[in-house]
Amino acid sequence: MKYLHTMVRVTDLDATINFFQTLGLNELRRFDSEGGRFTLVFLAAPGDEDAQVELTYNWDPEELDGGRNFGHLAYAVDDIYTLCQKLMDAGITINRPPHDGRMAFVRSPDGVSVELLQKGDALPAADPWQDMANTGEW
């Protein structure tokens, strides 16, 4: 058995791709189904192409309800402070800042929770992160 991907339905494909690319993921492939009226986009972190996120975009408008049965996606990152600053500079809210130099949470445009974990040991606590308040749900 081999893990293939996690599928996430999205309502704004371009905004969601931009979000994940800002996180550092690359688009691997895309499939448009005229008959099924949907688009699939597969993304992965560089060097970790086996752990893919599949974005499913249905062309006909639909309302998506966020189920609590789906928790979050998680990625190990080289420098949590640098990535969180990059995300903030791109207008992405850091819902749970890396107070401890170890963990942060953000949400995609459709509200999918993404956990960011510092590779190895936590970084030393630093400003502005250690005093930054949590925002919304994560």
Segments from the language model and where they lie:
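Eukaryotic phosphotyrosine signaling hubs
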Residues: 3-5, 68-72
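Short, mixed charged/polar active-site loops
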Residues: 50-52, 113
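Short, charged/polar surface micro-motifs in flexible loops or helix N-caps
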Residues: 46-50, 60-62, 80
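Vicinal oxygen chelate
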Residues: 30-32, 39-41, 75, 81-138
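Short, low-complexity disordered segments enriched in Ser/Pro/Gly and basic
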Residues: 63-67
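Core segments of cupin and vicinal oxygen chelate
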Residues: 1, 7-50
